[in-house]
Regions:
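Extracellular/oxidizing-compartment recognition motifs
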Residues: 2-378, 386, 401-412, 423-430
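Well-ordered alpha-helical scaffold segments within catalytic/enzyme domains
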Residues: 390-400, 436
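Long, structured ligand/cofactor-binding scaffold of large enzymes
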Residues: 433
Length: 436
């Protein structure tokens, strides 16, 4: 017998969106708004009590700009990362929907919702710097609807409004897609995503300006951690550790911190290549992208696992400083790209052709970040011409990507990543034959 599946509709326009846009429409005193913008993450929370009834379904819709992480009663919701996907915010902003029936506690129970907001490309990576090229769209903001349907047919709604509480005095002191993330564990907020937390010193969330774009459901695959890689080469040079993961990729490094003193600063620098002797990173091709993550220890680390949340890097090599007795098994590279299925493989007796195929596969995977990018590492990472046409509702027909999504945002990938790679591979063989 087949398992019964549930199907539902998202909000159909403004009439069904009860939540308000909330956040804080200004920088805080410690933030920087210049060519290397530094804006701390905003943390928002609310608590509510369910009715003394049995819950049938609970569905949550939210748009967190530029990026978000969602928690209910201390549990992170979903395995997506860097969500929602970027868009031309002047035309479209994307929301995600989640079935949270299992996470919401019924029967007159206390519940809590917590949302962390990152900057993404909404509050852009470079403020007051070439706005014609890298526009900014405002400060991070949230809109949320939680719809709880009880077995008796009644409905309870929890919406984002000015009753929510907000703080920017949390551990993510800065997040910037080009430059990386600064995380200060001394400023962690404890059980802020669980009911009963004392948020009396937090600010009241503001009702903030609306984004220009139309709010639409995200129908494309979310970005996820799709693979993990262990270090291929691990070497120490004085107080520096140089790690080669053996493959160029896009994502970040997750580090396990056994013990550390409060205030110790672990620095993780990323690069695609090293200098000739292999002892130093070569970051010249990154241009102004700093591609560095910082973790400031609180002294309570006990095999603490950490990675950045709202930035990613194109890299193969990593330099780690500020952490004594680092071991290779303390590090793992998490490879991030759109959740596209592999529907085939290629292998032949020619090693060069196999390598061409693998390189093409990795290149395409690294550049699928909600929209196809031109690169995942330097201070650009912009969509190509085709993507801009998709964003504007145009249609670009080619052998790999054919049809705009119904929301006019981007392509529907009819053929998955490995199919795209195969077509590129065939094209390369054709070129080689013609050259001969």
């Amino acid at each position: 017998m087949e398992r019964a599946c549930r199907w539902g509709m998202g909000p159909l326009g403004e009439i069904h969106w009860k939540g308000r846009w909330i956040g804080w429409d200004a920088a805080f005193a410690w933030d920087r708004e210049d060519s290397h913008s530094r804006l701390s993450s905003r943390y928002l929370r609310t608590e509510f009590k369910t009715q003394a009834k049995e819950i049938k379904y609970a569905t949550l819709h939210l748009c967190g700009l530029g990026m978000y992480e969602l928690f209910i009663n201390g549990q992170r919701i979903g395995d997506q990362v860097l969500a929602p996907a970027p868009s031309d915010y002047r035309r479209t902003v994307l929301y995600n929907s989640f079935d949270v029936t299992k996470q919401v506690a019924g029967g007159n129970a206390d519940n809590a919702i917590g949302v962390t907001l990152g900057n993404g490309r909404f509050y852009t990576m470079r403020q007051n710097y070439k706005p014609y090229k890298i526009p900014t769209f405002g400060y991070p903001k949230l809109r949320l609807n939680l719809i709880i349907e009880y077995t008796d047919g009644s409905i309870q709604r929890i919406n984002s409004d000015e009753k929510w509480r907000l703080t920017a005095q949390g551990p993510i002191r800065s997040n910037n897609e080009y430059d990386g993330e600064i995380y200060d564990a001394r400023m962690e907020l404890g059980n802020w995503t669980q009911p009963g937390y004392d948020d009396s010193k937090w600010l009241k969330a503001q009702r903030v300006s609306l984004p220009y774009g139309t709010l639409r459901g995200n129908t494309a695959p979310n970005m996820k951690v799709m693979k993990t890689l262990k270090p291929a080469v691990f070497k120490q040079y004085g107080d520096r550790y140089m790690i080669d993961f053996g493959q160029n990729m896009a994502g970040w490094v997750r580090i396990n911190i056994a013990k550390a003193a409060a205030g110790d600063t672990i620095c993780i620098r990323y690069a695609e290549r090293v200098k000739n002797d292999g002892t130093e990173l070569d970051v010249e091709n990154l241009r102004h992208s700093q591609s560095t993550d910082y973790y400031i220890c609180n002294g309570k680390e006990n095999n603490t696992s950490w990675s950045s949340r709202f930035s990613y890097h194109g890299f193969q090599y990593v330099e780690v400083t500020g952490y004594k007795n680092l071991k290779a098994e303390d590090l793992v590279a998490e490879v991030v790209y759109d959740d596209l299925e592999d529907n085939g493989t290629f292998e032949c007796s020619n090693d060069i052709m196999n390598r061409v195929y693998r390189n093409a596969w990795w290149g395409i995977s690294s550049n699928y970040k909600g929209v196809p990018l031109d690169c995942p590492q330097r201070d650009e990472r912009q969509p190509g011409l085709a993507t801009m046409l998709w964003e504007r509702g145009g249609k670009v027909s080619c052998s790999t990507m054919e049809t705009p999504m119904p929301n006019g945002r981007m392509i529907s990938v009819k053929r998955s990543v490995k199919t795209v790679v195969f077509l590129i591979f065939v094209r390369l063989i054709t070129i080689i034959i013609h050259q001969k």
